[in-house]
UniProtKB/Swiss-Prot annotation:
InterPro entries: ATP_synth_OSCP/delta_N_sf (IPR026015), ATPase_OSCP/dsu (IPR000711). Its main location: membrane. GO terms for cellular component: plasma membrane; proton-transporting ATP synthase complex. F-type ATPases have 2 components, F(1) - the catalytic core - and F(0) - the membrane proton channel. F(1) has five subunits: alpha(3), beta(3), gamma(1), delta(1), epsilon(1). F(0) has three main subunits: a(1), b(2) and c(10-14). The alpha and beta chains form an alternating ring which encloses part of the gamma chain. F(1) is attached to F(0) by a central stalk formed by the gamma and epsilon chains, while a peripheral stalk is formed by the delta and b chains. This is ATP synthase subunit delta. NCBIfam families: ATP_synt_delta (TIGR01145), PRK05758.2-2 (NF004402). Belongs to the ATPase delta chain family. F(1)F(0) ATP synthase produces ATP from ADP in the presence of a proton or sodium gradient. F-type ATPases consist of two structural domains, F(1) containing the extramembraneous catalytic core and F(0) containing the membrane proton channel, linked together by a central stalk and a peripheral stalk. During catalysis, ATP synthesis in the catalytic domain of F(1) is coupled via a rotary mechanism of the central stalk subunits to proton translocation. Pfam families: OSCP (PF00213). One of its GO terms (molecular function) is proton-transporting ATP synthase activity, rotational mechanism. The lineage of its organism: Bacteria, Pseudomonadati, Pseudomonadota, Betaproteobacteria, Burkholderiales.
Amino acid sequence: MAELATIARPYAEALFKASLSDLNGAAVWVEELETIAKNPQLLQFADNPNVTAAQVYELIAGIAQGALPAMAQNFLRTVIENGRLSALPEIAAQFRVMKNAQSGSSDAVVYSAFAIDSTALAELAATLEQRFARKLNVSVQLQPELIGGIRVVVGDEVLDSSVKARLEQMKMALTA
């Protein structure tokens, strides 16, 4: 993992510096490229020695939902030509960290057993921003195994109010 982070850092820094004028726009296409690059079949295709960098680029550009901006095209070509497609998710993660550091915000992942409607999510986001004393970029991921409640991860901080966590606490108390 440390090696992947070391490989990704110069790409993330260059991307951050090049996109300072439109960080939010860049974040959108970086996230899309990250999602595409996580596909194991795509990585297997890209690792095939009979496949050219141009073919990999055309495939990814075709998968992308919209036309990629010129900066995204150049960035993607560079990553593919240097054989670093597998590092793209880590590049995206480091880019997000730099973007958040500049804006003074953090990413928050809310794990929930059930879908959260937009009104409840907005209220939850406001409460979490007060609790963590900073602006949060909230995303939701469903985890039915939580049974009920939510688990929030902000950086290295975890706020777990799920039923599963409470059951685990009760189990620990009973077996202690």
